[in-house]
Amino acid sequence: MTLLKNDTFLRALLKQPVEYTPIWMMRQAGRYLPEYKATRAKAGSFLDLCKNTELATEVTIQPLERFDLDAAILFSDILTVPDAMGLGLYFAEGEGPKFKRALQHEDDIAKLHVPDMEKLQYVFDAVTSIRKALDGRVPLIGFSGSPFTLACYMVEGGSSKEFRTIKTMMYSRPDLLHKILDTNAQAVTAYLNAQIDAGAQAVQIFDTWGGVLSDAAFKEFSLKYIRQIVAGLKRESEGRRVPVIVFAKGGGLWLESMAQIGADALGLDWTCNIGEARRRVGKQVALQGNFDPFALFGTPESIRTEVARILADYGHGSGHVFNLGHGINQHADPEHAKILVDTVHELSRQYHGG
């Protein structure tokens, strides 16, 4: 594989010295970019875009052509794994993802098993293709949803505001939910390891819905299974460490517990103070985040002010990857995203070196 020209992102995750704070943005390849919309129209549907190696490569690279980002992230969807389990993923216009066969009956849950990774070969082909297209420019991040977040969609049959169905199962038949979560954890471990084998240089586990759980439930039904995945991941590839980032939206309460599961970095949503988070867990893990995605709707001046505040809160030294606290909004102005990226690079140098 080609030598990396810019490994600042990987070094920051391992708290090695860097010259500036690296930045990438969750959902950086997405609907806020006109070029993404054009490619998606060419693909036909979102799922067709994910499954077309050439087009998935194209949209992964698009934000790097526009912004000076320090990492690329595989263009895919967290729901590829349950789709490979036979749940029948589809996207309803204006309603987001849905499953034809939600897991709400004991018989269906008993039949659930780890999918053959060959069913996800299109994802691994995309990873290899993107690495080739990047040609060592920046590292490539692979990713998956967490077992609990995947289970939310699998049990509810789509997205939910209340999570009533999965929470009912959690409190009335925890054995059934544990069966789903254990299967998901095994599947995600195999899936991320296959992404690493295909060329992913770091991986992120997205626990988007962990924050809806009580303290005890988060530890039993989410964190336990993320720990299981982290323990099973390949941590070396191509002669260097493959860092693992865990991002639990709404997980600021549990940073200490999350810092103990063996991940290299924790992602923070915008509700946390990153300086406080560093004082709490900065000796154990690097931190990623945590600019409010809606702060991009401010003025160029307010964006600079917010970047300066986050950088100052984190303070001197490595161990910070700048990111949004959640995915970039589809209505964000790409010019404002450029201001964000350039400002992070400009203002962060004072916190590194001598």
From Swiss-Prot:
Keywords: Cytoplasm, Decarboxylase, Lyase, Porphyrin biosynthesis. It catalyses: uroporphyrinogen III + 4 H(+) = coproporphyrinogen III + 4 CO2. The record marks 77 as: Transition state stabilizer. InterPro entries: UROD/MetE-like_sf, Uroporphyrinogen_deCO2ase_HemE, Uroporphyrinogen_deCOase. GO terms for cellular component: cytosol. Pathway: Porphyrin-containing compound metabolism; protoporphyrin-IX biosynthesis; coproporphyrinogen-III from 5-aminolevulinate: step 4/4. The keyword NADP does not apply. Substrate binds at residues 27-31, 46, 77, 153, 208, 326. CDD domains: URO-D. It comes from the Bacteria. GO terms for biological process: protoporphyrinogen IX biosynthetic process from glutamate. GO terms for molecular function: uroporphyrinogen decarboxylase activity. It is found in: Cytoplasm. Pfam families: URO-D. Its EC number is 4.1.1.37. PANTHER family: METHYLTETRAHYDROFOLATE:HOMOCYSTEINE METHYLTRANSFERASE RELATED, UROPORPHYRINOGEN DECARBOXYLASE. Homodimer. Catalyzes the decarboxylation of four acetate groups of uroporphyrinogen-III to yield coproporphyrinogen-III. Belongs to the uroporphyrinogen decarboxylase family. This is Uroporphyrinogen decarboxylase. It comes from Neisseria meningitidis serogroup A / serotype 4A (strain DSM 15465 / Z2491). The gene is hemE.
